[in-house]
């Protein structure tokens, strides 16, 4: 049985004051013990969040890590080892905003996935297609290519300590959401691709849906057989909304 997971990606948001207020609001939420909950603050707030999550059922991750592990001459980058030293457990890898805006290729994403695990973090590998690719009927092709790069480079065994998030790019921050059936089709294809290498591992990998997940659509999405939770963007900055999404995953 796969444990549901809800992950909150705070993106480039927050001040010290607003982050403290948000975590304090989380404390007042009735969060289901059956659901694994993680938040991904900006680098500048990771330490602050780690300092105040004691007593809150939330683990902490980073939104990115360097493509090399360890320490060394890579100005401006933060390694998985440094994030683990702070107390992080998770890291997002391959988010569409980094693929599209910052030009991260499938090869770079695969390197970051490997570096994350080498440093002791559990990666959340983000996959997803643009609106143009969906309208061209290429959704499954694009997602299979993105996943295939990591599978080929790192092997299916690497996914025993990783999570995959499907985020259709056209649904991120747009208010648009894939229907539960559209999302399930892609999630099933992802699990099938993993199963061609190892069915047991494939059955154990948690697959999250991201892309305008809200309290009013979460339950319908999470009811799908291969959707094990959500990667939540804007709604994770509202404690009541995020709490409701977590409770939907627990049901």
UniProtKB/Swiss-Prot annotation:
Q: EC annotation?
A: 5.3.1.1
Please give the catalytic activity noted in the UniProt record.
D-glyceraldehyde 3-phosphate = dihydroxyacetone phosphate
Source domain of life is Bacteria
Catalytic residues, chain numbering:
95, 167
Question: Which pathway or pathways does this protein act in?
Answer: Carbohydrate biosynthesis; gluconeogenesis; Carbohydrate degradation; glycolysis; D-glyceraldehyde 3-phosphate from glycerone phosphate: step 1/1
Q: Which cysteines are joined by disulfide bonds?
A: none
Amino-acid positions noted as binding substrate in the UniProt annotation, renumbered to this chain: 9-11, 173, 212, 233-234
Keyword Isomerase applies: yes
Q: Which PANTHER family match?
A: TRIOSEPHOSPHATE ISOMERASE (PTHR21139:SF42)
Function text: Involved in the gluconeogenesis. Catalyzes stereospecifically the conversion of dihydroxyacetone phosphate (DHAP) to D-glyceraldehyde-3-phosphate (G3P).
- Which UniProt keywords are present, listed alphabetically? Cytoplasm, Gluconeogenesis, Glycolysis, Isomerase
Q: How does it assemble?
A: Homodimer.
The UniProt GO MF terms for this protein read: triose-phosphate isomerase activity
Family membership: Belongs to the triosephosphate isomerase family.
Organism from which the protein derives: Stutzerimonas stutzeri (strain A1501)
Identify the HAMAP family for this entry: TIM_B (MF_00147_B)
One GO term describing the cellular component: cytosol
Put simply, this protein is called Triosephosphate isomerase
Enzyme class, top EC level, equals isomerase
GO biological-process terms attached to the record? gluconeogenesis; glyceraldehyde-3-phosphate biosynthetic process; glycerol catabolic process; glycolytic process
Location (main, coarse): cytoplasm
Subcellular compartments:
Cytoplasm
């Amino acid at each position: 049985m796969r444990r549901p997971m809800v992950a909150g990606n705070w993106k480039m948001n927050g001040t010290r004051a607003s982050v403290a207020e948000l975590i304090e609001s989380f404390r007042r939420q009735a969060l289901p013990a059956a659901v694994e909950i993680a938040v991904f603050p900006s680098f500048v707030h990771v330490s602050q969040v780690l300092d105040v999550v004691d007593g809150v059922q939330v683990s902490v991750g980073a939104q990115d890590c360097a493509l090399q592990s360890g320490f060394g001459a890579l100005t401006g980058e933060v390694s998985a080892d440094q994030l683990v030293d702070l107390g992080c457990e998770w890291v997002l890898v391959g988010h569409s905003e980094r693929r599209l805006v910052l030009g991260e290729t499938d090869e770079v994403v695969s390197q970051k996935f490997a570096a994350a695990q080498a440093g002791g973090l559990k990666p959340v590998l983000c996959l997803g297609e643009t609106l143009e690719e969906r309208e061209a009927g290429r959704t499954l092709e694009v997602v299979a290519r993105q996943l295939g790069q990591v599978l080929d480079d790192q092997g299916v065994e690497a996914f025993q300590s990783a999570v995959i998030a499907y985020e259709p790019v056209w649904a991120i921050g747009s208010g648009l959401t894939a229907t539960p059936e559209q999302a399930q089709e892609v999630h099933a294809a992802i699990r099938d691709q993993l199963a061609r290498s190892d069915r047991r591992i494939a059955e154990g990998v948690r697959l999250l849906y991201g892309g305008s997940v809200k309290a009013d659509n979460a339950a319908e999405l999470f009811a799908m057989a291969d959707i094990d939770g959500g990667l939540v963007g804007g709604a994770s900055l509202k404690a009541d909304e995020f709490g409701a999404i977590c409770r939907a995953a627990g049901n």
